[in-house]
Amino acid sequence: MDVDSEEKRHRTRSKGVRVPVEPAIQELFSCPTPGCDGSGHVSGKYARHRSVYGCPLAKKRKTQDKQPQEPAPKRKPFAVKADSSSVDECYESDGTEDMDDKEEDDDEEFSEDNDEQGDDDDEDEVDREDEEEIEEEDDEEDDDDEDGDDVEEEEEDDDEEEEEEEEEEENEDHQMSCTRIMQDTDKDDNNNDEYDNYDELVAKSLLNLGKIAEDAAYRARTESEMNSNTSNSLEDDSDKNENLGRKSELSLDLDSDVVRETVDSLKLLAQGHGVVLSENISDRSYAEGMSQQDSRNMNYVMLGKPMNNGLMEKMVEESDEEVCLSSLECLRNQCFDLARKLSETNPQDRSQPPNMSVRQHVRQEDDFPGRTPDRSYSDMMNLMRLEEQLSPRSRTFSSCAKEDGCHERDDDTTSVNSDRSEEVFDMTKGNLTLLEKAIALETERAKAMREKMAMDAGRRDNLRSYEDQSPRQLAGEDRKSKSSDSHVKKPYYGKDPSRTEKRESKCPTPGCDGTGHVTGLYPHHRSLSGCPHKDRVPPEILAMHENVLKCPTPGCTGRGHVNSNRNSHRSLSGCPIAAAEKLAKAQEKHQSCDVSKSNQASDRVLRPMCFVKQLEIPQYGYRNNVPTTTPRSNLAKELEKYSKTSFEYNSYDNHTYGKRAIAPKVQTRDISPKGYDDAKRYCKNASPSSSTTSSYAPSSSSNLSCGGGSSASSTCSKSSFDYTHDMEAAHMAATAILNLSTRCREMPQNLSTKPQDLCTARNPDMEVDENGTLDLSMNKQRPRDSCCPVLTPLEPMSPQQQAVMSSRCFQLSEGDCWDLPVDYTKMKPRRVDEDEPKEITPEDLDPFQEALEERRYPGEVTIPSPKPKYPQCKESKKDLITLSGCPLADKSIRSMLATSSQELKCPTPGCDGSGHITGNYASHRSLSGCPRAKKSGIRIAQSKEDKEDQEPIRCPVPGCDGQGHITGKYASHRSASGCPLAAKRQKDGYLNGSQFSWKSVKTEGMSCPTPGCDGSGHVSGSFLTHRSLSGCPRATSAMKKAKLSGEQMLTIKQRASNGIENDEEIKQLDEEIKELNESNSQMEADMIKLRTQITTMESNLKTIEEENKVIEQQNESLLHELANLSQSLIHSLANIQLPHMDPINEQNFDAYVTTLTEMYTNQDRYQSPENKALLENIKQAVRGIQV
């Protein structure tokens, strides 16, 4: 029977273990209880809870099957320390106050909850032994009930784990209740649903706790009866000792910290919800607690030494059972009573308990959000330690039982008990392992959910910050108070999803709580600006901030901006760095006058946004009469212009002609000390209407320098015109770039020493032809009586005015002036003679003798184009430099000019429209007919007149010397356009009915160079004698169709630009080129021959040098051998004395050798015996020398 019961118990245990785990794997860690949505769970109210432990729905269904066996007559132990309890005492209680409120199955709860505390090692040891004995009790119950209660066994095993989680739920519910109670005064009636949900949750928890206590009471009563039967049936003292150990386990577990914490939590819950517990319950609880303490002390003694007195055992058992049953019943009744009162209480009628201070709530709130993962982690670590310590203790306990049984029990009983205890501990160990895994998985899942929620909240906050961002920010004190309030009020609402929206506004930097922000203590700051922890921002959040438009000033972080403290500011307005750079640049350029550049637009233009007044710095002490406003629509164009152009102040002596025209100011700004007076003289006769009738008038001034001097003028008109914002921006930007294109490199010779009053004179005697070509004579003096009353900088300076004035240095006199636009139809052309002297005095010349044209376009835009005449100022020493060679500059100019259809000008840089084939069209839209288009990138004027004389290209009109042309006194002008003589003859020809041929010589040769073009369809009309491709419709189409090569294009351009009249010259030139090529070829052949000869001679020279080197080497070797031979000879003949000679040595070696040679040559002469002996000795001496 024992074996069968063990097998059956083992099967039921394994089933009970596997039931809550398998659904977790199948359903992605969702709660396996059918119909449970995760609310009310102990471990954090997670819908994905992976076990039935802590599930209130599972407990409710389970307790419905078990009805309470007997009523609870006592409700004692919940008000012992009700007055002194607080939030901080939820985990700190005396060990003497709640002994009666124990239940038998708190043994399992105590093992986990005590691990949670991790403070008392002694209690850990006692609990482990208690756990072991409880399992043995369960084993004996299985033995007694053979037909058994498999289902009940399974439910009891689940209850052991569920009650552990239930106690945690009670404590967490109490913590949340403390936080919610504190917020009752701060929340209005909009959040009543949250309190209702919370009350419902607490009521459910209390009901479940009561049912658990009821089940525990029933089980304790059943086990006590079974234990009594078991003790009567067992005959050995070892069984008595074992029963005594079980009773001791029961009484010891009643004193666990879990029950004390539960009691404290219930008392605080009762106080928080207005429920008052009776005092008699408290008194009785205390009395029972004292009696239980006595019995517990007795049991401690009995646990150490087995007692053989049966009466003592029964007395202890009865007292323990009575205390346990009464305590469990009291706990159950208290839970039911509190839940009922809580459900009947209205949330609005609750009052905050007076003994809960704000400090306790703040502390509770701060500890709460991180409590769940910390507790889970500590549970896991403590369970691992418990698992390691369980196995040795079980073995020790089994061995002790065996030793006791050796004297009073047989071997069979001892072996059965030891096997049961080992099986119990193995099962307990398996359950703890599963619980450990569950806690670890739950911890990871909670961490992942928190990170995901934080990321989502950061993204939503960033998106929302872009929509409802306002430039105005709260004061520092308001920010601090609000942030501190929100920090206090921020609980963790795990259940209600509506609360998550109120926690989203915070700094998106992970781990940043708002401290250290530039803008103050902002936990809810929604952007990265001002955050000291930007380096910790993950790439996901940075990706959302990549498209933020920031302040374009390099190195600007957004701090110090006038209108906001945002680094996402999109303009230069209000930027302190930009303002400081502009001021420093202006001062630096004012001080250095070595290189002069243009200064066009107002400093105001660079600050297009709001708060301009705060950054307006009056420069050099001159005040501004009219404040400037700038349309915001021009922001992009003004910023573009600011990035491309530089502005500069220039001065020459004490006289300044350059005025910085600031729309719509009346007075202009000056640099030199006398400039302010000059400005008053310029505008002394101004009428108020001339400066105030236009809402937005374009402003530009031309600062044209000649050497270090600065001279400029401003166009003026009495009438004002309304400009669109785009036109104004395009004009200002184009003027700023165009005026950079001219520079006069030499100092003026005869600059006037006093500022001049600039006016213009009307001349009613001038006349124009149908094309608007003027006849302007340089020697014709104009009356200087009529002058315009005022110069106001309301009109833009036309490009032709800038180009002409920048091409020469001019001189101003007091009487010189310029006028308003003139009606050309009333003017008569004047001629000029070739005998006119080149140098003209200032008295005989008007600086602005050219009349101004006035043409109106649909937009009512008037473009005055004054064309001044002036004496030569070192014409041969100046160059006109343009930007036309830069494709980017030309492209930008054209794009800016194309923004307005009413203001269409010739796109050639520096061209004012004069000299065009189609007439004097300042508004010409293309390069066709432009005389300067073919010179792009080339200096317009030669640096020396000698170069002009080498290849003279004159005006083709017979009798015209070039004087009086619209473009100036160009004797070398190569087109009839702009020629006053040609215009007059053409008009006469039209009036007489005969076609005008403006060139009488070589008319047939003057034709359009485009092949097959007869001159018809040209822009300028049917010009058979037109000699360029400009305006030819066939040239463009032919080029597009044929796609001419570069050489062909170059040939056509050369024919058009050089004015070649016929192909004969080309043939002649080709022949000359051929002859030159032939001569060059012959010369090249001769050069090749010479090079060949030179190469041959060089090779021979090298050969000779090599031979000489060989000879030198041989000579050296011979000399070396001769020296050796002479030494040998001297050594050999040292002992031989020739007659009449000294012994041989280096000094007389040559003479000695000569004598010997002579002796051997003429041996006949030396026939005497002495000589023969001498010769024989010499032979013997020389015989040893080898040559």
From Swiss-Prot:
Zn(2+) 4 binds at residues 906, 911, 924, 930. Induction: Up-regulated by retinoic acid. Zn(2+) 2 binds at residues 507, 512, 525, 531. Residues 1058-1132 form a coiled coil. Brain. Residues 344-358 have a biased composition (Polar residues). The keyword Phosphoprotein applies. It is found in: Nucleus; Chromosome. It comes from the Eukaryota. Zn(2+) 3 binds at residues 551, 556, 569, 575. GO terms for biological process: negative regulation of transcription by RNA polymerase II; nervous system development; neuron development; neuron differentiation; neuron fate commitment; neuron fate specification; regulation of transcription by RNA polymerase II. GO terms for molecular function: cobalt ion binding; DNA-binding transcription activator activity, RNA polymerase II-specific; DNA-binding transcription factor activity; DNA-binding transcription repressor activity, RNA polymerase II-specific; metal ion sequestering activity; retinoic acid-responsive element binding; transcription coactivator activity; zinc ion binding. Interacts with SIN3B. Transcription factor that plays a key role in neuronal differentiation by specifically repressing expression of non-neuronal genes during neuron differentiation. In contrast to other transcription repressors that inhibit specific lineages, mediates repression of multiple differentiation programs. Also represses expression of negative regulators of neurogenesis, such as members of the Notch signaling pathway, including HES1. Belongs to the MYT1 family. This is Myelin transcription factor 1-like protein. It comes from Mus musculus (Mouse). The gene is Myt1l.
